Structure formats: C-alpha cells, structure tokens
UniProtKB/Swiss-Prot annotation:
Protein name: EKC/KEOPS complex subunit GON7
Entry keywords, A to Z: Acetylation, Nucleus
GO BP term (any one): tRNA threonylcarbamoyladenosine modification
Cysteine disulfide links: none
Record-level GO cellular component terms: cytosol; EKC/KEOPS complex; nucleolus; nucleoplasm; nucleus
Subcellular locations according to the entry: Nucleus
Modified residues (N-acetylmethionine): M1
Assembly information from the UniProt record: Component of the EKC/KEOPS complex composed of at least GON7, TP53RK, TPRKB, OSGEP and LAGE3; the whole complex dimerizes.
Biased composition (Acidic residues): 66-81
Amino acid sequence: MELLGEYVGQDGQRQRLRVPCEAPGNADHFQGLLSGVARMKELVAELFGSPVQGEAQDRVAAAPEEALDGDDEDDAEDENNIDNRTNSDGPTAKRPKPPS
C-alpha cells in the first residue's frame, strides 16, 4: 500500500509525492497507513514550507491586525449579523410586563 500525491505549481510544474505504507514486521496495516500519512505530512510541509511561510509573513506585514485573527471574512459583516436570529418555535422569548 502507498500514498500518492501530486502538486501542480502556479507555473504548471508538476511534483509527485509517493510514500510507501509498509508496516515493519507483522504490524497492523492501519499502523502502516498511519506512519505513511505522517511521512506524507512531513513531505507536504517540506514542499510548502518556504512559500507558505513567506506568504504568511507578507499578510502580517500588509495588515497585522487582520492577519492575526485568522478570519478572512469582513469583521463589519460579522458585527451586522449578530442579532439576525430567528425563533421558529413560537413567539419571541420576551417576558410580558407585570400588571401595575
């Protein structure tokens, strides 16, 4: 068993990743798969290490307060949608005023 991956860069260049998932000895096949996934993760991290780190640093330099929150959505839009909740179970949950 093996894991295969292929990355096509922005320039169109293809790079193939291949990781065998052989478990040592008579170990469980799932253990071999887990070790293969861990190795593939390492290869992908190596492949994307430099460009991803550079891109993250560029985002922080361009807009540090927005890059740190990790949210790509517009914060103003989030604030506008806070109270847009519906209650389909019945009337509103407001308490009636007690008689005076």
